[in-house]
Amino acid sequence: MSGNRKIVIDFKKILPFAVSILLFVVLFIRMFSYKEHISDYIGLSSSIISSKLLTFIVLLGIWLEYTAVLIVVLRPFFEIKTIKNSTKYITPFIFVANLFLLKPSVLLLTGQDNTLLTVLLIIEEALGLVISIYYYVKEFKTEEINYKSILVSLGIFGAMMLASMPVYFPQFVFGLTKLQMIPKSLTPAHRILLYGNILFPVALYFLLRNKSQGVINCALIYISLATLIGYLLPYNYQTFSEPWTWPFHLCNTAMFIIPICLVFKMKRLFYFTYFINVLGA
C-alpha cells in the first residue's frame, strides 16, 4: 500500500458551492457599498421616480431580489423540493427582471446614479442566473416537470418572502399610519406586535415538527439569514469607522451569532447565546 495518496478534487461538484458562497459575499459587499436613501421615502408619491406604478414594481423587485439570492445560495447545500423548484422556475425570472430594472433600482436605493452599486448588482444578478441555469440544465433530463409541485413551491416562496421583506417596504408603499404605540399601554398596535412575536415561533414549530432535519435546518438558516439582511440594511461602509454604531447589544449580536450557529452546527455557542440573551432580557 502506497504511503502517498492522491487527493482528487472534483471541480464540477465544488463549483456550485463556490459560486453560491461568492454570491453571498457579493450581496454583503453590495449592501455596505452605498448610503441608502430608500428608507427616507414615505408613500409612493414621495418617490424620486415619477411613476407610482414603476416605483412599486422596482420596490417589489428589490424585495424579491433578497428572497431569490438567499434561495439560490442555499440550493447547493439542500436537496429540498421547494428550493429546487424555486431555483429552476422562479428565481431566473427575478434576476432577469431586475437586470431590466437596474437603473431605477439604483436610483431608488441611493437617490442618484451609483456606478459601483450598478456593477455589483450586475455581478449579483449574473451569479444568481448562473446557479439557476446550472441546476435547470443539470436536472432537465433527470426530473420531470410537476406543475402541481411548482405551484406549491410558488406558494411557499410567497411565504418565504415575509422573512426577507425590507423594513422600509410598508412605509414606502402605505406611508405612515395614525396608530401609535405607547410602551406602557397595550394599544391595538402594541398588542398585534406582542402577539405576533409570541405566535410566530409557536406556528413555526408546528409547521416544521414533522419535517425532515434537512427541511428544518434549511428553514431556520433561511429565516436567520433573511432577518440578518433586513437588520443590516440601514448600515453602510461608514459603519466600520464608527465603533459606537456597531451592534454590541446582546440582541444585536444574536442576529449574527444565530446564523453562524445554524450554518456551522455550533450547539454550545447557540445555548450560551440563548442563556445570555434570556438573562439579559
Describe the residue ranges of each PLM region.
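Membrane-interfacial loop-to-transmembrane alpha-helix junctions, especially the N-terminal start
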Residues: K12-S20, E79-F93, N146-V152, S212-L225, ...
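Extreme N-terminal leader/anchor segments
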Residues: E65, S105-L176
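Short, Lys/Arg-rich, polar N-terminal cytosolic tail immediately upstream
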Residues: M1-I9
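Hydrophobic cores of alpha-helical transmembrane segments in multi-pass inner/ER membrane proteins
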Residues: L60-V73, L121-K138, R191-Y205, N252-F264
